Design a protein with these regions (language model features):
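Sec-dependent N-terminal signal peptides
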Residues: 3-14
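Sec/Tat signal peptide C-region and signal peptidase I cleavage site
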Residues: 15-20
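C-terminal edge strands of extracellular/lumenal beta-sandwich accessory domains
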Residues: 21-32, 55, 83-87, 91-101, ...
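Extended, solvent-exposed segments with strong compositional bias
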Residues: 41-45, 109-154, 249, 256-274
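Extracellular beta-rich ligand/substrate-recognition surface
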Residues: 41-52, 199-204
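Extended extracellular/luminal ectodomain segments enriched in beta-structured repeat modules
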Residues: 50-52, 60-68, 216-222
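A mature extracytoplasmic/lumenal domain signature
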Residues: 63, 71-75, 165, 227
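Mid-chain, structured segments of secreted extracytoplasmic proteins
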Residues: 67-111
Length: 326
C-alpha cells in the first residue's frame, strides 16, 4: 500500500484540492456525521450501532505549523440535532496522538472495545445542550503536528478524534475541520482524513446522492460491505473505473446487511465510489442515520478517505471500433 500511495503522490494523481480537511468533504456530499448518546436502553433503532465514532487526521511530515481540530455544532440540542423526547444527552470529544494512536489494532476496528482509546490523550471536552455552540464552532488546539503518531507508511503524523455518547438518547449531528487557524477554517495543505466505519446522516431529499470512497490497496482480492439500519431507503451503488454501477444488499430497520464481491484488477490502487441513492416513492425517508464499513478478503477494514485517493473514480467506457466487412 505504501508503494501505491507514494506512486500516486509522485505522479500527482491526488485531487487538485487535496488540502485542509472538512469532514465530511465536499465530494462526499454527506450533511453530517452522527453519534447518539447511548444511555438508558442503548437503543440502536435510531441508526447508531455503538454510540462512538473515530476519525483520523493525516498530516504530511513536511507540514510543521500548528494545527487545530474544529467541531461544528458540538452540543446536543437546538435546530440541527435529533431529539428523542427531551434533550438529555452528553457527548464527549477526545483527541489522541503519540505512539499507538493509529497503529494499535484496536484503534482500527469498528467497535469501541479494549484499547480503542490508544495513544496519548491531548484534549477532551464534554458537551450537553449549549445554545452558544448550537450551529457554531468549538476549536481544539493548537497541536504541533509532531504530537500525532508518526507513521513511515504515510510519511506523516496522525491524530485520532473519538466522539462518543456519554448518556442520554438524542442524536448528535456534527462536522469537523482540520485548520491552521483557531477561529477560521483554513486548509492544511496536503492533509487528509479517514475512518474505518462511517456513521452519518442521510439527506432528507431524494435528489442528493451521498458518497464514501474506500481505497483498494494492492493486497485486496475481494471486499465485504456491511451496512446498518439503512431502513430500505433506496439503493447503495458501487462505481469504479471499470464498474459501471453495481448495487449491493441494504439493511432494514435496526439490522445489518452484508455482501461480498470480487475486486477487478483495474481497481487496485484506486478508490471505489459507494453511492447512497434515496428512494423517491412511495415516500422519502426522513432523518435516516446509517453505518457502513468495508473489509478486504483478509478481514481488514478499508479506509474511507474523505478526499479519495486517486480522485473520484469515474467509469471509463470501453469504446471499441469494429471493422465492418464489405
Amino acid at each position: 500500500m505504501k508503494i501505491v500511495l507514494l506512486i500516486l503522490v509522485f505522479l500527482g494523481l491526488f485531487m487538485p484540492d487535496l488540502m485542509g480537511q472538512p469532514v465530511p468533504a465536499r465530494d462526499e456530499n454527506i450533511p453530517y456525521l452522527m453519534t447518539f448518546g447511548g444511555g438508558g436502553k442503548r437503543e440502536t433503532s435510531w441508526g447508531d450501532d455503538d454510540f462512538s465514532q473515530a476519525f483520523f487526521f493525516e498530516i504530511p511530515e513536511e507540514f510543521t505549523e500548528p494545527v487545530y481540530i474544529r467541531v461544528f455544532d458540538p452540543d446536543i440540542g437546538g435546530e440541527t440535532d435529533e431529539i428523542n423526547g427531551f434533550w438529555d444527552t452528553k457527548m464527549e470529544y477526545s483527541i489522541y496522538g503519540g505512539k499507538g494512536a493509529y497503529s494499535d489494532p484496536d484503534a482500527r476496528e469498528t467497535q469501541p472495545e479494549n484499547n480503542y482509546r490508544s495513544g496519548t490523550l491531548l484534549a477532551t471536552k464534554t458537551f450537553g445542550e449549549d445554545k452558544y455552540y448550537d450551529n457554531n464552532w468549538y476549536t481544539f488546539g493548537p497541536f504541533n503536528p509532531s504530537e500525532g503518531e508518526y507513521t513511515q507508511e504515510y510519511q506523516g503524523h496522525i491524530f485520532k478524534i473519538i466522539t462518543e455518547g456519554k448518556g442520554g438518547d438524542d442524536g448528535n449531528l456534527y462536522r469537523y475541520f482540520l485548520s491552521t487557524s483557531f477561529d477560521e477554517n483554513i486548509d492544511v495543505e496536503g492533509a487528509n482524513a479517514f475512518t474505518y466505519e462511517y456513521s452519518f446522516r442521510m439527506w432528507n431529499t431524494a435528489d442528493n446522492i451521498s458518497h464514501i470512497y474506500p481505497f483498494i490497496d494492492d493486497d485486496c482480492l475481494s471486499v465485504k460491505q456491511e451496512n446498518f439500519d439503512w431502513d430500505n431507503d433506496g439503493w447503495i451503488r458501487v462505481v469504479s473505473v471499470v464498474r459501471k454501477g453495481q448495487t449491493v444488499k441494504v439493511s432494514g430497520e435496526d439490522n445489518w446487511a452484508e455482501e461480498e464481491f470480487n475486486i477487478i484488477d483495474e481497481e487496485i490502487g484506486e478508490s471505489l465510489d459507494f453511492q447512497f441513492i434515496k428512494r423517491k416513492t412511495p415516500f422519502v425517508v426522513k432523518n435516516n442515520n446509517v453505518v457502513i464499513s468495508v473489509r478486504n478478503n483478509y478481514g481488514e477494514l478499508l479506509k474511507f478517505y474523505t478526499i479519495p485517493i486517486g480522485g473520484v473514480p469515474k467509469y471509463k467506457y470501453d469504446i471499441k471500433v469494429r471493422e465492418i466487412e464489405k
